[in-house]
Amino acid sequence: MISPKIRRATKIVATLGPASSEPALLEEMIRAGVNVVRLNFSHGKAQDHVDRARMVREAALRAGREVAIMADLQGPKIRVGKFAEGKVMLEPGAKFVLDASRKEPGDLLGVGLDYKELPRDVKPGDVLLLNDGLIVLTVDAVRGDAVHTTVKLGGELSNNKGINKKGGGLTAPALTAKDMDDIKTAMSFQADYVAVSFPKTATDMEMARQLCMVAAAEYRHRPGLIAKIERAEAIPHLEDILRVSDGIMVARGDLAVEVGHAAVPALQKKMIRMAREMDKVVITATQMMESMITNPVPTRAEVSDVANAVLDGTDAVMLSAETAAGKFPLETVLEMVDICAQAEASADWDNDTDFVGKTFQRIDQSIALGALFTATHLGAKALVAMTDSGSTALWMSRHRTQIPIYALTPKVATQRKMALYRNVRPLLMDTSADRDTALAQAEVHLKARDIVQSGDIYAITCGEPMGSPGGTNMMKISRVV
């Protein structure tokens, strides 16, 4: 297996859970290659997340690594209720009632609903998919609060399993009262990213942004906002959603249930491409290494799936139950590191830094991409961005190159946010307000970390005056003495 110390462009998001909540193990996982830790707000209480966030910060400090924290909101609970026996076995052809007014536990004839609006969202002929599409029901009739269905594809249905409508169309709002409280909790520990579940339009993300800004105001914090694309209705609005978000997550689970499994690979490629073109980050998620929940090695298909996402240009690949509840959380991270590194080593991305015909609207963006172009064609050892907000490093990272990007920033929050950017190694460094002194300090910093050595060429960008967000206006090509 490739050593976790190997340079790797693609970042790894790992979900924290019972299997990975021991501090020493979490530290090992961070050393092995975890760049972002996901806190799943579908489980646990507010204080649990506060405690886990503190544990992540402490583990990252011990490991000497920059790690971002992503708070993943639960979103609307579109689920069936509970059963008297905990589960039932539905047979094809059987009648089954989903009743929003039912109070008693469910049985073979029907079950209550957490989502009370379902009777108003469906009509006869609609197809409902339960438990990630493993059970399929056809709607026969809607009578008051009861949805009468026929089982088309049967199987075991247990407590609180999810409901999807084929083709989309459920009206549940993306943000619930619980989500609003959870945003306040996430801002109390200054989560670097907030992932919004089930957004359908840009308006959902704008509302989430406003809630985050209000909750974060007292901490002078600005989290990145990630839209989880998991509703069929979101696809036509993808460009608008991207425009008002900092990135997207290709959430293939619910999305596959709604649009059909066969449609997801092409949609994944489209979303990754659009995110990169619009200067946004993108995370590819769901069942990437699913078999490693119980097995010590991945399947060949899982290896190909992860490698394919890497070759598509995703910023990060995400582990969910594999690290939250699996038997082999550390081994899963190591396997994913190995797959990402080998996929990147085999790729030819030279044409991705050719900007012929591209126009730029901003000076700082022009400088960032000019440095990338020059470094690529000079065969530079490193590409260095002195950045206050992280924007320069983000623009550089939208284009795939084998040259590592080092982002030097005086702000801890910026350093952590850049942990998600593909091919960016964020480094914390205080610099002088004088440009020439700052450039000299940067070279000393790079040499001390063995990033560059005598004779190496590197490209570096900065702004004058120094420390002005969005003020990058200078590029310098240097040879180390």
Model regions: which residues?
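Non-catalytic helical/linker scaffolds that mediate oligomerization, partner binding
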Residues: M1-V481
